A protein has these predicted regions:
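Non-globular targeting/processing and membrane-anchoring segments
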Residues: 1-58, 84, 95, 102-111, ...
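A generic structural signal for short coil/turn motifs at secondary-structure boundaries
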Residues: 69, 101-102
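Short helix-loop-beta junction
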Residues: 80-88
Length: 182
């Protein structure tokens, strides 16, 4: 699905009946996060300069869900970054509709967002996700400390707010440079 299809799905989810009722608050809050990040994120000049040199056609599959807080923070940044890679196409795939995620587990779990970059023949070239290294280290540290889940989420989203997508941009820049030998 493209971004418009995804946002339409999200709108329907906000009306109820698609996800568990307990997800309602997450759906609303994450829509605000998604919209804010999509509106405000701007790629750096370095990313734009490097990404314009990518000529090999690729398809980027982003596995996501509207209820996922990490996805609400990362997917809009990913979409904005992809706008600068002229040879890249993308699609959004819902984690809970289909079995694609089962091929890309993170430590045995279905962590999202997950990004799969494929070549023209459909071969996987790269997989990223569900978080930047820095966000994952924060998550792992808090989890190891046994903090309550709501404290973990507050800390992680506080980190996302301060970072403003720059860690993701930096990681993706390094991956693109390595993948395409730029």
């Amino acid at each position: 699905m493209n971004l418009n299809d995804y946002l339409s799905h999200w709108d329907k989810a906000l009306e109820g009946g698609i996800y568990l009722e307990s997800y309602a608050d997450y759906l609303s809050l994450n829509r605000v996060r998604f919209n804010r990040n999509y509106k405000t994120f701007k790629a750096s000049e370095e990313f734009v300069k490097v990404s314009q040199r990518v000529s090999k056609p690729t398809h980027w599959i982003i596995i996501t869900e509207p209820w996922c807080g990490d996805a609400a923070q990362s997917v809009p940044v990913l979409l904005r970054l992809l706008e600068h890679i002229p040879s890249a196409s993308y699609s959004l795939s819902l984690r809970d509709q289909g079995s694609l995620i089962d091929q890309y587990l993170t430590n045995g779990g279905k962590g999202i967002p997950k990004v799969i970059v494929r070549d023209e023949q459909g071969n996987d070239m790269m997989v990223w996700g569900p978080r930047t290294q820095e966000a994952q280290e924060l998550f792992n540290g808090l989890k190891a400390q046994g903090v309550e889940l709501h404290v973990l989420h507050e800390s992680l989203h506080g980190w996302y707010a301060k970072d403003q997508g720059k860690s993701l941009e930096y990681e993706l820049l390094a991956l693109v440079q390595n993948l395409f030998k730029l």
